[in-house]
Amino acid sequence: MDTWLVCWAIFSLLKAGLTEPEVTQTPSHQVTQMGQEVILRCVPISNHLYFYWYRQILGQKVEFLVSFYNNEISEKSEIFDDQFSVERPDGSNFTLKIRSTKLEDSAMYFCASSE
């Protein structure tokens, strides 16, 4: 009986996790040549007002890039230079643009949102 209860609790937690709203990011992966422009799109949770971009270079820690609120950059890191830009063009998607990619831009990019 105890084993059944534990299995039921785990299943319930997994099921609850699947129904939570989530942030969607496209494309899921991008391969490009150096010097090309890349646009990464993020669809945040609908009622969220704050948006964030992070990146993680292979073998390194996750780095904060920029936060965005009320259609303006609210905070940015030192690595967020003129090569990068963010915008929320249609009021729902939140984009990160890398104007001219360099080898050191090779990384996993993550978006997030909060209320």
Curated annotation (Swiss-Prot):
Signal peptide range: 1-19
Lineage top rank: taxon: Eukaryota
GO CC, one annotated term: plasma membrane
UniProt subcellular location: Cell membrane
Classification via SUPFAM superfamilies: Immunoglobulin
Key words of the record: Adaptive immunity, Cell membrane, Disulfide bond, Glycoprotein, Immunity, Immunoglobulin domain, Membrane, Receptor, Signal, T cell receptor
Protein's UniProt name: T cell receptor beta variable 2
Organism expressing this protein natively: Homo sapiens (Human)
Gene label: TRBV2
